[in-house]
Amino acid sequence: MSFEISVEEIEELIETGNLNIDHALKELGATSQSSLNKPPSQSSRTEGNDGGTKISRNPAPVEAPAHTSTAQRSHNEENESGRQNLDSLSMISNKPQTGTLLMGSDTQLPSPSKTYQGLILDAKKRALNEPRRDQKITNEHGSMNDTRIFKRGGNIDTRKEAWVTQNQRSRTQPPLQDIEESTRFHGLTEEPQYPSGAIHAAHQSNQLPLSKNAHVEDVPKFANYASEILDAIKALEVRLDRIEGKVDKIMLTQNTIQQTKNDTQQIKGSLATIEGLITTMKIMDPGVPSKVSLRSLNKESEQVPIIVTGNGDVSKFVDQDNTITLDSLARPILSGTKQKTDERRAGVRIDALKITVSEMIRDLFGDCDKSKKLLESINMATTEQDINLIKTNALRSIT
């Protein structure tokens, strides 16, 4: 089973292996230092035929060297300080991680006899010898194979690469502390062929298609009237906003309605009180008695002599011919003339009487045909007698 690993994953695996080696070397260094101070029954390391390291007990006493060279001591101190700095800066656990590193068929396992620097150089050489992402190789059949790795959501045919090199990543972004996950590729955007509709997005297939052609039955249908549906939804939203505004206004008038109800109850109580007081009162209406008619009253009246005393013209009060007056010498004179009135004052009195009778008719009859006829007859009247006659007829029609 063949598989490929990206450059970033290889570098992260190398870094993890280096940290494990550092931890192992640190432990071995601590063991060797402690062996110098322990009794003679101390363990010693021996090389096996198979290239592995074996631990054996040596009963013979081993004496530590009295002194070491200055260069060797400085070299050990620098190694220990560098390891401590790496341990303090690294966010990965210092404990060795157990597991199997999956490599390609042509990858060699690191030899435990090599040093730390040698392991780093070997890893760099393997990374340089591996084919790049954009490199094409020829297989045994003579066809070209593209070594670029296809990720989820990506497109092999696109020219835009979804990754950057490690140097560019270190310049633009901080170093990652974990394995980077695959990023989502949103695809290429194209303008829809139907301006009045919309094409639904199809779900991405997990399998790599063999060709760019697709079956007609698998392609989702486009919406021909998407814009009209949106217009209808917007119209419904506008109507809903208007209805909400009207409901808010109605809710504001709720307090006014309650206040009106309270006022109505108070008015009903006051009206009931007034009705009770009216029943205790006796109202006398100075009108025509119901049992005696006006004609019977006129028959009962008789002519009697009337004496008007004082100076002045009696013609203003008496309009009959058979009147006796006294002249300037106090002599009785039979007056054969009719009532005389001042023409200037007569016109003013007639106009005032017309206005009074017209208002009375409007109050009694309102705006009806009978009221209009009476008003027309009042306007056509020229004397006070005519106006008084119209007034009398109007009052009789009511009773």
UniProtKB/Swiss-Prot annotation:
Disordered: annotated span: 30-112
Biased composition (Polar residues): 30-46, 82-112
Highest taxon above the source species: Viruses
Annotated InterPro entries: P/V_Pprotein_paramyxoviral
Stretches assigned to coiled coil: 226-253
Record's subunit section: Homotetramer. Interacts (via multimerization domain) with polymerase L; this interaction forms the polymerase L-P complex. Interacts (via N-terminus) with N0 (via Ncore); this interaction allows P to chaperon N0 to avoid N polymerization before encapsidation. Interacts (via C-terminus) with N-RNA template; this interaction positions the polymerase on the template for both transcription and replication.
Family: Belongs to the rubulavirus/avulavirus P protein family.
Domain text: The N-terminus consists of a long intrinsically disordered tail. The central part contains the coiled-coil multimerization domain (PMD). Forms a four-stranded coiled coil structure. The C-terminus constitutes the alpha-helical domain that binds to the nucleocapsid (N-RNA complex).
Biological role: Essential cofactor of the RNA polymerase L that plays a central role in the transcription and replication by forming the polymerase complex with RNA polymerase L and recruiting L to the genomic N-RNA template for RNA synthesis. Also plays a central role in the encapsidation of nascent RNA chains by forming the encapsidation complex with the nucleocapsid protein N (N-P complex). Acts as a chaperone for newly synthesized free N protein, so-called N0, allowing encapsidation of nascent RNA chains during replication.
Protein name (record): Phosphoprotein
Gene name, Swiss-Prot/TrEMBL: P/V
